[in-house]
């Protein structure tokens, strides 16, 4: 039996989970069709998902149709959970991108499709909610060709709420024959030579084009009224093909971790090659760690079943492997989809329990949530001692707050959400602290040179010190100290886009230790950073704004107020497309404003595009290291020189 892994993707509220539930029901995997409104869906299994009607975590289920086993991964539709969606992309053989017939192409729709297109993932577009009043399919078709791709093939026509095929294995319209010829040279040559080409030949060529992500079939339906679901199942089993297995050696990728109500850790793996068997002893990440598979499940027709073996391209579930982390692999390192640029959160908030004595409980709960979702980053501010969480947005914050209260029985308060800035040195500087020169209490001399690098370059560390003079353990201690120092600059933000060179060293044998070098490094780094000064960097968003032409003047005025950099404007009689960059801090709510002043027609699509020097006169009241007496003494001694 062929096995495929299919992602269900959509902008929030396009009907993604409802379509998934209908696929389960129509294929016989469930006895009734779950409804989001009723809170009885299979894929949204978390209480908070059922109650709020949104998908928070990617969930996996399975159906069988036309002899094909299809593992369905239902992904979040909200931008705040984009990291969860990105992890899903790595394991997909194909995708169904769902559009709402009434709302059409929305910001998340375009972002998802551009990623699918970039990664060359075979994709079926499904227009949902065709039953709604006011649907204008012809206008939507134009929008799809304008904003998604010209390479779409509309497989059906819609008449009075029902769908009818216009392209199949036995029948194809003449204009569709031309479409196929324009996309395939072999068919074109046969067509020009007047060779006989059957509908099946065209159909098989379409399948091959879809598999190569060169053509995107478009289908229609309504999950609410079970319209077009069987046709969608047929398309999935026809157009989405399993990958060819390249090896019999085990290779498995861990893409999801969850904990059941009893606290058991459940790990979900995609078997890339080979097979995983009960009682196998397998290596994790090519390390010296081995685990024994003591239990093994897979997903079959919407439910989990115990098995002795899970084969290539299928999903395996194992329990109570404490060493597992998302992104780990078993056996050979898997070849996964490349080209994803991980989006780091650009917002943060301090969180504290309503009862101060429950702080350790909050930390433990957050650690469990981090195991399930590695994009959840939290830390303890070493100066304020506050617990800080990095966030993608307000909805994620609300979900975390609810999970802490309902799942871990601890109530917390979040402070105001703030933008995460970064710091970069302004100029090249060199700083040295000498051994046995007060107030240096460490048996070490360290010299560091700091110099700014281009934006986006990150941290680079080099050493001018010979390992013949100062061995690896001492130099590694300096490198650790540099990385630790970069976590908090003059204003408390991460220091980035700089090169740090270890330029001078002296030690006394046998009294000097790596710890001396590790502990002195932050003081040298700090003094050098103070001498250089820092630029404050703010997160930027690359945006595409599509609006009716009548709203273009307002849009340009708005973008100027948001301190954006407009890079391109193109307009026709009806629409304007504007591209550029805008600070995250000024544009957090602009998508909803666009929807308001364009009556839902406008799209403001953004994606992170690095940092730039802030333009808004950033200032704060943070004074780091005020209680560090040794730093004060270093500063005083340096000022006397």
Swiss-Prot record:
GTP binds at residues 10-17, 74-78, 128-131. SUPFAM superfamilies: EF-G C-terminal domain-like, P-loop containing nucleoside triphosphate hydrolases, Ribosomal protein S5 domain 2-like, Translation proteins. Signal peptide: none annotated. Coiled coil: none annotated. GO terms for molecular function: GTP binding; GTPase activity. NCBIfam families: small_GTP, tet_protect, tet_protect_Q. This is Tetracycline resistance protein TetQ. It comes from Bacteroides fragilis (strain YCH46). The lineage of its organism: Bacteria, Pseudomonadati, Bacteroidota, Bacteroidia, Bacteroidales.
């Amino acid at each position: 039996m062929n096995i495929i892994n299919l992602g269900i993707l959509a902008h929030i509220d396009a009907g993604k989970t409802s379509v998934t539930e209908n696929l389960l029901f129509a294929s016989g995997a469930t006895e009734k069709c779950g409804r989001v409104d009723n809170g009885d869906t299979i894929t949204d299994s978390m209480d908070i998902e059922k109650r709020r009607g949104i998908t928070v975590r990617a969930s996996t289920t399975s159906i069988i149709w036309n002899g094909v086993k299809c593992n369905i991964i239902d992904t979040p539709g909200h931008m705040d959970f984009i990291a969860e969606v990105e992890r899903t992309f790595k394991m997909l053989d194909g995708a169904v991108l769902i559009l709402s017939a009434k709302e059409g192409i929305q910001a998340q729709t375009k972002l998802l499709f551009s990623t699918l297109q970039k990664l060359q993932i075979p994709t079926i577009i499904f227009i949902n909610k065709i039953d709604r009043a006011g649907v204008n399919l012809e206008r939507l078709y134009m929008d799809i060709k304008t904003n998604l791709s010209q390479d779409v093939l509309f497989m059906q026509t819609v008449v009075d709420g029902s769908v009818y095929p216009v392209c199949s294995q036995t029948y194809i319209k003449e204009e569709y024959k031309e479409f196929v010829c324009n996309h395939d040279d072999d068919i074109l040559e046969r067509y020009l030579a007047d060779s006989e080409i059957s509908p099946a030949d065209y159909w098989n060529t379409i399948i091959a084009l879809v598999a190569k992500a060169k053509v995107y079939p478009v289908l229609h339906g309504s999950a609410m009224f079970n319209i077009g679901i069987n046709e969608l199942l047929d398309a999935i089993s026809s157009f989405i093909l399993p990958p060819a297995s390249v090896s019999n050696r085990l290779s498995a990728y861990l893409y999801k971790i969850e904990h059941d109500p009893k606290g058991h850790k459940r790990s979900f793996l995609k078997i890339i090659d080979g097979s995983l068997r009960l009682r196998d002893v397998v290596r994790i990440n090519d390390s010296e760690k081995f685990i024994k598979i003591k239990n093994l499940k897979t997903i079959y027709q919407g439910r989990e079943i115990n098995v002795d073996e899970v084969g290539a391209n299928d999903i395996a579930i194992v329990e109570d492997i404490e060493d597992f982390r998302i992104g780990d692999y078993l056996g050979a390192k898997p070849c996964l989809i490349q080209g994803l640029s991980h989006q780091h959160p650009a917002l943060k908030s301090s969180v504290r329990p309503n009862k101060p004595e429950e702080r350790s409980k909050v930390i433990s709960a957050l650690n469990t949530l981090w195991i399930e979702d590695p994009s959840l980053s939290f830390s303890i501010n070493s100066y304020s001692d506050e617990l800080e969480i990095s966030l993608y947005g307000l909805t994620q914050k609300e979900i975390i707050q609810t999970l802490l209260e309902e799942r871990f029985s601890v109530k917390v308060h979040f402070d105001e959400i703030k933008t995460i800035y970064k710091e970069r040195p302004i100029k090249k500087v060199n700083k040295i602290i000498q051994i046995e020169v007060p107030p240096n209490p460490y048996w070490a001399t360290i010299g560091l040179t700091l110099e700014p690098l281009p934006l986006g370059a990150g941290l680079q560390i080099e050493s001018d010190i010979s390992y013949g003079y100062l061995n690896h353990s001492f130099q590694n201690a300096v490198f650790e100290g540099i990385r630790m120092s970069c976590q908090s600059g003059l204003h408390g933000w991460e220091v980035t886009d700089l090169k740090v060179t270890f330029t001078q060293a002296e030690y006394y044998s046998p009294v000097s230790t790596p710890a001396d070098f590790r502990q002195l490094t932050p003081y040298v780094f700090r003094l050098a950073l103070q001498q250089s000064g820092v630029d404050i960097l703010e997160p930027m968003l690359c945006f595409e704004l599509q609006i009716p032409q009548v709203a273009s003047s307002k849009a340009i005025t708005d973008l100027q107020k948001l301190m954006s950099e407009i890079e391109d404007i193109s307009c026709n009689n009806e629409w304007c497309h504007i591209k550029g960059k805008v600070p995250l801090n000024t544009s957090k709510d602009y998508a909803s404003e666009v929807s308001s002043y364009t009556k839902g027609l406008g799209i403001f699509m953004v994606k992170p595009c690095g940092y730039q020097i802030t333009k808004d006169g950033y200032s704060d009241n943070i004074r780091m290291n005020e209680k560090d007496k040794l730093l004060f003494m270093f500063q005083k001694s340096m000022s006397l020189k």
